Swiss-Prot record:
Lineage of the organism: Bacteria, Pseudomonadati, Pseudomonadota, Alphaproteobacteria, Hyphomicrobiales
Top enzyme category: transferase
Keywords, in A-Z order: Cytoplasm, Glycosyltransferase, Purine salvage, Transferase
Cited InterPro entries: Ade_phspho_trans, PRibTrfase_dom, PRTase-like, UPRTase/APRTase
Domain of life: Bacteria
A Gene Ontology molecular function term of the record: AMP binding
Record protein name field: Adenine phosphoribosyltransferase
Pathway note: Purine metabolism; AMP biosynthesis via salvage pathway; AMP from adenine: step 1/1
EC number: 2.4.2.7
Gene Ontology CC annotations of this record: cytoplasm
Pfam family, one: Pribosyltran
Length: 181
């Protein structure tokens, strides 16, 4: 990815200071999603490394991972798997607790969302501490997925999420980095 592509994507992301609490800068991709050219560029760049690899499924984390993951799945002719908050899926599920900044939460996936050995890419808008993404990787592996990679539009490298995923042996790809929180 070229420096100009990174600049275009970073510029399309709105930064909101002191949200959701003082000292946090919220990186809002809704501006990127609303800009047709930037959205197309982001999806094209997310997909590019995986073309021709025979990826079976894209797993998207609620909620912005659904938007990006659905677009990726379409372009890669792959299926899409939603990873949802507990209690939101209608069929039998497998769940996994994961760490939040203050406490824990649970995510779920349908028991039959992935066949054993299927190649899956995890997708979301942002990787920060990695708690949600690590939980999602463990959940996917629990039902037999081969997690090929995880991709995100934004990396907040100071928070260590990329390193947490890499410690699990998961390749991580991102499009833009922002320092701080």
């Amino acid at each position: 990815m070229t420096a100009s592509t990174k600049d275009i994507l970073a510029t399309a992301i709105r930064s909101i200071p002191d949200y959701p609490k003082p000292g946090i800068i919220f990186r809002d991709i809704t501006t990127l999603l609303g800009d047709a050219a930037a959205f197309r560029l982001a999806v094209d760049e997310l997909v590019k490394p995986y073309e021709g690899l025979g990826v079976d499924k894209i797993a998207g984390m609620e909620a912005r991972g659904f938007i990006l993951g659905g677009a990726m799945a379409h372009q890669l002719s792959a299926g899409f798997v939603p990873i949802r908050k507990k209690g939101k899926l209608p069929y039998r599920t497998v769940s996994m607790a994961y760490a939040l900044e203050y406490g824990t939460d649970e995510m779920e996936i349908h028991v039959d969302a992935v066949k054993p050995g299927e190649k899956v890419i995890l997708c979301d808008d942002l990787i920060a501490t990695g708690g949600t993404a690590v939980g999602a990787v463990k959940l996917l592996r629990q039902i037999g997925a081969e997690v090929v990679s995880a991709c995100f539009v934004i990396d907040l490298p100071d928070l260590g999420g990329r390193k947490a995923l890499e410690a699990l042996g998961v390749e991580v790809r991102t499009l833009a980095e922002f320092s701080g929180h």
